[in-house]
Amino acid sequence: MILMSGPCVIESYEALSAVAQALKPLSEKAHIDFYFKASFDKANRTSLESYRGPGLEKGLELLSEIKKQFGYKIITDIHESYQAKHIAKVADVIQIPAFLCRQTDLIVEVAKTERIVNIKKGQFMNPSDMQHSVLKAIKTRGGTQATYEQSQKYGIWLTERGSTFGYGNLVVDMRSLVIMRSFAPVIFDATHSVQMPGAAGGKSGGDSSFVPYLARAAAAVGVDGFFMETHLNPKEALSDGPNMVQTNALIPLIEQLYDIENLTQHKNGK
């Protein structure tokens, strides 16, 4: 099972390392392929006044320290094409945000690196249309078609994070997992799927109480891994606190997901 977890944004090295330390029990499990996640910049915050992060240079420096201290593989976001070569020096996975999932130049630049490319499905996207984004990356790396096998070979992943459902709300169509998994490995982002974009007066809201339910459903349907942002105290988080999982609640949830995944895969023979 792939697991990407960590705080939404880098707040400080102390906060970053505290979460990294709390996640060690998960990272040490043989059945979990763990990636530590944190963003150096939240470039699409609702308000200009909202905290964005330390920026590219300082953020990568802090993530590099986490990598050295804990031995973690790193995943972080990219926002502009020029950042790819810099991020690739630190990150093992470069993530293309949902709002940028169709940006050809960005996808191509990330695909030119030797890092895994994780493309988040836009909240506005038909899941079947994500094969075009996948194919941009695959062809950049010398492949020819968007199939699960070629996506896996060339290191191209997709992440489901919910679809727009009216104003300020998202819903998860579990069929999306099946559709996208026909042409790429799929990660389920359980924390952003419970986000309520822009619904909290100048910032996004959310309801993390729904995270376990959606995650268990995704495990039963079948995915390649999970993305879950976490914080020691989500109420004090500087970004996405309402939809993050408290770190001490994450470990038992992940074990439960692993059990469900094993059960359903055995029954389905996959």
Curated annotation (Swiss-Prot):
**Molecular function GO labels:** 3-deoxy-8-phosphooctulonate synthase activity
Gene3D superfamilies listed in its UniProt record: Aldolase class I
For the biological process aspect of GO, one term held by this record is:
keto-3-deoxy-D-manno-octulosonic acid biosynthetic process
Where does this polypeptide localize? Cytoplasm
Pfam families given in the database record = DAHP_synth_1 (PF00793)
Pathway linked to the protein: Carbohydrate biosynthesis; 3-deoxy-D-manno-octulosonate biosynthesis; 3-deoxy-D-manno-octulosonate from D-ribulose 5-phosphate: step 2/3; Bacterial outer membrane biogenesis; lipopolysaccharide biosynthesis
Family annotation (SUPFAM superfamilies): Aldolase (SSF51569)
Tell me a GO cellular component. cytoplasm
Q: What does the record give as the reaction this protein catalyses?
A: D-arabinose 5-phosphate + phosphoenolpyruvate + H2O = 3-deoxy-alpha-D-manno-2-octulosonate-8-phosphate + phosphate
**Mostly located where?**
cytoplasm
UniProt xrefs under InterPro entries: Aldolase_TIM, DAHP1/KDSA, KDO8P_synthase
List the coiled-coil residues.
Answer: none
**EC annotation from Swiss-Prot or TrEMBL:** 2.5.1.55
Which keywords does this chain's UniProt record carry?
Cytoplasm, Lipopolysaccharide biosynthesis, Transferase
Q: Which family does it belong to?
A: Belongs to the KdsA family.
Looking up NCBIfam families in the UniProt record yields: KDO8P_synth, PRK05198.1
Q: What is this protein called?
A: 2-dehydro-3-deoxyphosphooctonate aldolase
Q: Which organism is it from?
A: Helicobacter hepaticus (strain ATCC 51449 / 3B1)
